[in-house]
Amino acid sequence: MRQVLWLLKRQKMNKDKMKKEKFTFKEKVEEISSKQIKEQQEEIKKLKMPNIQTMDFLYEDNKESEIVYEYPELIALCPMTGIPDIYTVKIIYTPNKKVPELKSLRFYFLAYKDLPILHEHLANKISEDFKKAVEPRKLRIELDVAVRGGIRTKIIK
């Protein structure tokens, strides 16, 4: 909890600073060192996100089933600018003994709303948390980032 408060406080300070001062995008990005980004991302990696609740999968002998969840409303903050990034996350997996309860999966995604996290780290965090909760036979995470600055980004984990 302390880590989340630290991150939110830092984001608020950055937003307050942005309101008070005129700046160019270049100046804003240059204020943040790669060391600061690394420290911030390491703190986020340790954060305990809401649990993804699970239910028993009653057809575990069916090893060929593939389940796909797509959530087009995932929002997280860009750690460089504080601007919200919008994602479509797709989870493609082969179930083992458990499946996620979808309401808890949605609340899990909503918890990222105020977190400053890099795209690549977000895909890995979702993958790690989903594996830990659901223990799938196979898992693929696709994170499609809304186009920003003319660059289309897709992370596949």
Task: List the model feature ranges, each with a label.
Residues 14-157:
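N-terminal intrinsically disordered, cationic/polar leader segments
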